[in-house]
Curated annotation (Swiss-Prot):
ATP binds at G515, E516, T517, G518, S519, G520, K521, T522. It is found in: Nucleus. The keyword Cell division does not apply. It comes from Schizosaccharomyces pombe (strain 972 / ATCC 24843) (Fission yeast). It comes from the Eukaryota. Residues 193-209 have a biased composition (Low complexity). It catalyses: ATP + H2O = ADP + phosphate + H(+). Probable ATP-binding RNA helicase involved in pre-mRNA splicing. This is Pre-mRNA-splicing factor ATP-dependent RNA helicase prp16. The lineage of its organism: Eukaryota, Fungi, Dikarya, Ascomycota, Taphrinomycotina. Residues 502-665 form the Helicase ATP-binding domain. Signal peptide: none annotated.
Length: 1173
């Protein structure tokens, strides 16, 4: 005979099979009993499979296997006489619906006892009424009440009926129960004894239908006619024989918790088969309906339709047609606009923290507490022992001559007129936004439209950007259009002294050429040397401080020589090389020549080097001066020409050992200088008054006004126009602004000639001093201020300050009034301020900028001691030490101060050390594609264009590209969108982006790809942008800040407060990241972080071990511990070991005997004579 263990084993297999489709084993155990019930009422495996599909998407093979297991269990149950309650995992009767497994804590409310005995009286009256009717109604009510209270812990909801339970009802055999009493539970014994006690009295019948009589008595304990509350007998019970029960009918009186299904008889069923089919469909629908609320696999599953089996094709067609009619029909333009707005709304919700970005984990335990503290402790290598990072105070190198002078004080205060106008515009804007009816219900009725919508429609029209050829045509004068290139050359002042100049060049290795702007020294010197044959021994190189100048001059010289650009004459700038094997005249930026010196220390391929515009004293120019001075001592056959204005030519001559100076006479007209009688407190107000006074009282002639920046220029133009409109019958005036961030097509307007009878006024920055020449200028208004970028080595930030100009700048500005005729220069400061409060020359860039890249280049050139390098103007010592320390922290220098392998790779990229390290580290993380895109975007000016009249629309367009956790990723996002739109100019205009700047970034990216291919660095891409943020942290960990308070950050190492700019993607978030890194820190009105990315503190400790260590404190309900992640012990040990090794080497070197070597005299070879010398 089969054992009870086999039945348990089969039931366990059934549970294991169901576990594959359930979320947990408990759910499978609960489902197993329901599946057994379905199997008992199923006549075939197909019917069982259809019923099983309501619990989940079971496969057909698994359904057949489950059906076989259920039949085996049912067979064992029949043979062993084990009830379903006795099966494993079942403590009571299994029913569908909600089952309370643990009800020990639930107890029914005890009936309140009446103090007046009314409850006893009510029971007696009910008993009397039942005796009159001949029925024991009271006993039935009491039994129901007792059973409902006693079985409260077995509360079960109604289970959907089995479609076959009415037609199939297995009877239990008494013999099977008696033979296996050892397996019976207490409940089974109680029910068996009750059944035995009732069988003798309740199953006796004259016609032999004992079972039917029993069921009638048990199912109809009450009369079908009962009185209602009004005493009549119209209330009837439904025929209880129509009740449906399952196969495991619990014999006994009904309780108030029994599951009853009322079936109402149909009026006229067609046939018994139709009724059976209808009952099966109803049972199936009931099961689908109830199971739809189960939490197994259908909760939240909106795709599954439990009534799909009963739908007809016509129903589905009607439903699809109805859904299609409900859809909102949109045009293609409206659909694109709706999609764009949806993306913006989703981005805003993610940014504000209302919704989560996809793929972010949010699982955490409420009982878990984790705190991470970032500890800061700077380490220093031994080669910097004794070096004072702050040996000089920050104020030693200042941009003003006298901090207490009137010019310095007014520069710090700024313009009061501009400040008041800014505040007034903000108040006006807020008031108009508050009182605007556009977009409201009343505004819609009145037909008012939002001005931003109209601006948006106007902004969709692409703006045509003028090319260089178009701009050059606009700049052509009548003289240039009527004269040939030969005649134009002969008209220049430099052509008149051609022979004398060549004679001095032949006799001297170094020559300082002094000439005013427009004398022709830039374009003619290289042609003079070419015509004299210097190109036969090597190329003639000409350096320019700006790349635009190098490109334009090369184009002009190639046109004058009648050759194609890139053949005989070419140019080379960073990330762009337009030269060929036949190029003999090469124009380039000074940085390009500095990079070439890394490959060729002696510059062998050049015979003559011309350093143009050296008076601007750029950083690379000063470094080249020191390098060329050494090259000249090693090569006697190379010549150096340094062109400069009259301002500091003597300093260049002294640096090169008293080199001769050659002056090219200028062709400028006399300029009268007019100083102010008293200092002016507001330079914008004074400039506006002076322009109006010139326009109303002076003869014809255009006006040039020098201002500090974009905001001052725009305010000056608006105020001049407003005040001129207040005058009656005032002469016409054309007001044109120009600054670096203005689009090229708008910049070209200043070169257009004004209409007859109209005076032109140009308001510009110091870009109009040397870079641009505007014809027709007769009056110059000099405010005496400019914006200068200063580097604070103690804080490691660049500050953009409004500072007084130098005397050399003032003379250069005044000279702009005498290009076409006599002019007047109005200086809005006193003559004493010019003499006492201004420097003679502008502060060199090498003394006010970060020198990390410069030091890296010098180390690559073999300069061991940076302090011993021959600088024309020595940079501050603290700046040099800070640059060396930064390179050591980045891994470019070792503990001895020598270049590492990483540092050599970094020096090959023409960019800042941090950006170079980004590309190198990206190879290890396989994200070079994304990193070089970010680096190229960081290497160009801002790509955003924000016109003052459409500022809000520009800001809204910028927000569409925001990435909540990173501004670096925002730049990557912009470039990728531009790339997907085919590098379209119209797309850039629509989204307020500089197409020219983006194209420049694309060229830089292509050049980086070529450099990487030479270094054998592969291009790879990743989809996880967290990896990109991790790589960014590896290069910018020294520029990190942590959150403090609300909306404020502090620098981790210096403790200086930092702020997010309003244009940052992180600004306006619903939360502030704890730790961020930034690209640069700019000090204007506040300390603003530019290009910010949120990072993890563990990343900072991983890559910046010289600065940071992480202390983690963890607590939950089971454990608590503190952990510290730090690489400081290993770094300290390595620094100490290297310090001891260096000390031993120095001691051994000092103890070595000095060996005297015989000096050998080497006779220098005379330089070769070239034809024409």
């Amino acid at each position: 005979m089969l054992s009870h263990n086999q039945n348990d084993l089969l039931f366990t297999k059934l549970i294991d099979k169901l576990t594959d489709y359930m979320s947990s084993k408990d759910a499978a155990t609960s489902l197993a009993s329901r599946v057994l019930t379905i199997a008992k009422g199923s006549s075939s495996s197909t019917e069982f499979s259809n019923a099983l599909h309501t619990f989940g998407r079971f496969s057909d093979n698994d359904s057949v296997l489950i059906y076989d297991l259920c039949k085996s269990i049912i067979g064992l149950e029949t043979n062993l006489g084990i009830s379903k309650d006795k099966l494993p995992g079942n403590d009571g009767s299994q029913v569908a619906g909600l089952v309370l497994s643990n009800r020990s804590g639930l107890k029914g409310r005890e009936p309140k006892k009446s103090q007046l005995g009314l409850d006893v009286l009510a029971v007696q009256k009910k008993k009397e009424k039942s005796q009159v009717e001949g029925r024991s109604e009271l006993s039935q009510v009491e039994n129901d009440s007792l059973e409902s209270i006693g079985n409260y812990d077995r509360v079960e909801f109604k289970r959907p009926k089995n479609p076959h339970e009415k037609h199939f009802r297995p009877l239990r055999q008494r013999s099977s129960v008696d033979d296996h009493q050892e397996f019976e539970s207490e409940d089974d014994k109680y029910r068996r004894n009750s059944y035995s006690s009732w069988s003798g009295s309740n199953f006796e019948s004259s016609n032999g239908s004992n079972r039917r009589r029993y069921r009638t008595q048990m199912e109809e304990p009450l009369s079908s006619k009962r009185r209602n509350r009004f005493g009549n007998g119209s209330r009837r019970d439904v025929d209880s024989s129509k009740y449906s029960h399952d196969s495991d009918y619990s014999y006994g009186a009904h309780s108030s918790w029994d599951a009853r299904d009322v079936e109402y008889p149909e009026e006229d069923p067609e046939s018994k088969a139709d009724r059976q089919r209808w009952e099966e469909e109803q049972a199936h629908l009931d099961r689908d309906w109830y199971m739809n609320s189960e939490s197994q696999n259908l909760l939240g599953d909106e795709v599954h339709n439990p009534f799909s089996d009963f739908e007809t094709v016509e129903d589905r067609a009607h439903e699809a047609e109805f859904i299609e009619k409900q859809k909102k029909h949109l045009s293609i333009e409206a659909s694109d606009r709706f999609k764009e707005n949806s993306m913006w709304e989703k981005n805003r919700m993610i940014t504000s923290g209302v919704s989560k970005a996809p793929g972010l984990e949010s699982d955490y335990s409420l009982m878990e507490e984790r705190r991470v503290h970032l500890l800061v402790d700077e380490l220093r290598p031994h080669f910097l022992d004794g070096a004072e990072f702050s040996s000089k105070k920050v104020g030693d190198i200042t941009s003003v001559r006298d901090p207490q002078s009137d010019l310095a004080i007014n520069a710090r205060l700024g313009s009061r007129l501009v400040r008041e106008r800014r505040e007034f515009r903000e108040r006006q804007k807020a008031a108009s936004a508050a009182t605007s009816l556009a977009g409201t219900s009343l505004g819609n009725v009145m037909g008012l439209k939002d001005s931003n919508d109209e601006d948006a429609k106007a902004g969709t029209t692409p703006v045509k950007v003028a090319g260089r050829s178009e701009q050059s045509n606009k700049k052509d004068t009548e003289f240039a259009r009527t004269k040939s290139y030969r005649e134009q050359r002969e008209f220049l002042p430099a052509f008149a002294v051609r022979e004398q100049l060549l004679s001095v060049i032949r006799d001297n290795q170094v020559l300082i050429v002094v000439g005013e702007t427009g004398s022709g020294k830039t374009t003619q010197l290289a042609q003079f040397l070419y015509e004299d044959g210097y190109h036969r021994n090597g190329m003639i190189g000409c350096t320019q401080p700006r790349r635009v100048a190098a490109m334009s001059v090369a184009k002009r010289v190639s046109e004058e020589m009648g050759v194609r650009l890139g053949s005989t004459v070419g140019y080379s700038i960073r990330f762009e090389d337009v030269t060929g094997p036949d190029t003999v005249i090469k124009y380039m930026t000074d940085g390009v020549l500095l990079r070439e010196s890394l490959m060729q220390n002696n510059l062998e391929k050049y015979s003559v080097i011309i350093m143009d515009e050296a008076h601007e004293r750029s950083l690379n120019t000063d470094i080249l001066m020191g390098l060329l001075k050494k090259v000249l001592s090693r090569r006697r056959d190379i010549k150096l020409l340094v062109t400069s204005a009259t301002m500091n030519s003597q300093k260049f001559s002294d640096f090169f050992g008293g080199a001769p100076q050659f002056t090219i006479p200028g062709r400028t007209y006399p300029v009268d200088i007019m100083f102010a009688k008293a200092p002016c407190s507001d330079y914008v107000e004074a400039a506006v008054r002076q322009v109006l006074q010139i326009h109303l009282s002076q003869p014809a002639g255009d006006i040039l006004v020098f201002m500090t920046g974009q905001e001052d220029i725009e305010a000056t133009c608006e105020i001049i126009a407003d005040r001129l409109n207040q005058l009656h019958d005032a002469p016409r005036l054309s007001i044109l602004p120009i600054y670096s961030q203005m689009p090229a097509d708008l910049q070209a307007k200043i070169f257009d000639s004004a209409e007859p009878g109209v005076r032109k006024v140009v308001v510009a920055t110091n870009i109009a001093e040397t870079s641009l020449t505007v014809h027709g200028i007769s009056y110059v208004v000099d405010t005496g201020y400019c914006k200068l970028k200063m580097y604070n080595s103690k804080l490691g930030i660049d500050t953009l300050q409004v500072t007084p100009i130098s005397q050399a700048n003032a003379n250069q500005r005044a000279g702009r009034a005498g290009r076409t005729g006599p002019g007047i220069a109005y200086r809005l400061y006193t003559e004493m301020a010019y003499i006492r409060e201004m420097f003679e020359t502008t502060l060199p860039e090498i003394q006010r900028t970060n020198l990390s890249n410069t030091v890296l280049i010098l180390k690559s050139l073999g300069v061991e001691e940076i302090s011993d390098f021959d600088f024309m103007d020595r940079p501050p010592n603290d700046t040099l030490m800070a640059s060396l320390y930064e390179l050591w922290t980045l891994g470019a220098l070792d503990n001895f101060g020598k270049l590492t392998t990483l540092g050599k790779k970094m020096s090959l990229f023409p960019m800042d050390p941090s950006l170079s390290k980004l590309i190198i580290i990206a190879e290890d993380y396989k994200c070079t594609e994304e990193i070089i895109t970010i680096v190229s975007m960081l290497s160009v000016p801002s790509v955003f264009y924000r016109p003052k009249e459409r500022a809000e629309e520009s800001d809204a367009a910028r927000e569409k590209f925001n990435v909540p956790e990173s501004d670096h990723l925002m730049l990557l996002n912009i470039y990728q969108h531009w790339q997907r739109n085919g590098y379209s100019n119209s797309w850039c205009s629509k989204h307020f982006l500089h197409s020219k700047t983006l194209k420049r970034a694309r060229d830089i990216r292509q050049q980086l790809v070529e450099i990487m291919s030479k270094q054998k660095i592969s291009l790879e891409s990743v989809s996880d942008w967290d990896i990109v943020r991790r790589v960014l942290c590896s290069a910018y960990f020294h520029q990190a800040a942590c959150a403090k308070g609300i909306g404020e950050y502090v620098h981790l190492r210096s403790g200086m407060p930092c702020h997010l700019h309003v244009t940052s993607s992180l600004y306006g978030l619903g939360y502030l990241p704890d730790y961020v890194i930034y690209h640069e820190l700019v000090l204007t009105s506040k300390e603003y972080m530019n290009i910010v990315t949120s990072v993890d503190p563990y990343w900072l400790a991983e890559f910046g071990g010289v600065y940071y260590s992480v202390k983690e404190r963890f607590r939950n309900e089971t454990e608590s511990y503190d952990r510290v992640f730090s690489s400081k012990p290993q770094l300290d040990a390595q620094i100490a070991a290297d310090r001891e090794l260096d000390a031993k080497q120095k001691l051994a070197k000092n103890q070595e005997p000095v060996k005297s070597k015989r000096k050998s005299v080497i006779r220098a070879k005379p330089p070769r004579r070239v034809r024409g010398f």
